[in-house]
């Protein structure tokens, strides 16, 4: 039997976005981030003053010639759940994935980081808490296949956090 519980969260129409290659966050997972670039330190500062929400997304075909990389269309909105500033000015952040989003358009601004208008409509199911019985052997096979796929692609995944789910 599956039961669905909708989490109450106000989803913003525009979000700051952190494009990070070889990095994926999924809804309901928590990942560590080491923030050291000044523009993303500014982004975290602004986010901490408001709703603590930022978007994570993969850049497309990143190369050294692109000053502003093109992005994939789908990313994940995350909430900062832990924050620590280091002595050398870096931020150690834990980000909890909430819901996937689709980029609508980039918002022009004077900020050093990028902001986008986004749409969550196709991903509301990410906010549901599913309580479902799965066989442990099914999960082992799924994780084995996922690990293999992500290792081939060079993605960094917090497997310990995923296994808690």
Question: What function would you assign to each model-found segment?
Answer:
Residues 2-165:
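N-terminal low-complexity, acidic/polar interaction/targeting segments
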